[in-house]
């Protein structure tokens, strides 16, 4: 899958993975679902769900460390800045051959355009926050969120195309 294809999928994902409503109880349910999926996949994740700058769910699985919490913060900051997933932001920067600090003047100590943070978007209302994970390779973090969110919003299993490592454009 090349860069253009991945960007197109990221746009589709953000359109399809919208919620009807979201509250503190929803955050708890989503966070628990992410934890169960991580356990199934055998990965240890730090999980954070933030709405309007308030943390509604936070959990650090055994095997994570303080560094994972920092990655959560940096990825979440990208979602808040650009209103797109942290993975899609990284792809857009690659496409433009630039970086977060060069394009937006932000510190890379505070922002990370790597997979693992996804906007929480309410249908016909907009983005209210983000769901964030850290602990696996960043593409795996992103795909785990896609899987869980697809199930959470009631999409049929397999209806969301998971992303694969980038391949160069053929000549």
UniProtKB/Swiss-Prot annotation:
Pfam families: HbpS-like (PF03928)
Lineage, uppermost ranks: Bacteria, Pseudomonadati, Pseudomonadota, Gammaproteobacteria, Enterobacterales
Origin: domain of life: Bacteria
Record-stated family: Belongs to the UPF0303 family.
Disulfide linkage: none
Cross-referenced InterPro entries: PduO/GlcC-like, PduO/GlcC-like_sf, YBR137W-like
NCBIfam families xref list: PRK02487.1-3 (NF002694), PRK02487.1-5 (NF002696)
Protein's name in the database: UPF0303 protein YPO2534/y1653/YP_2345
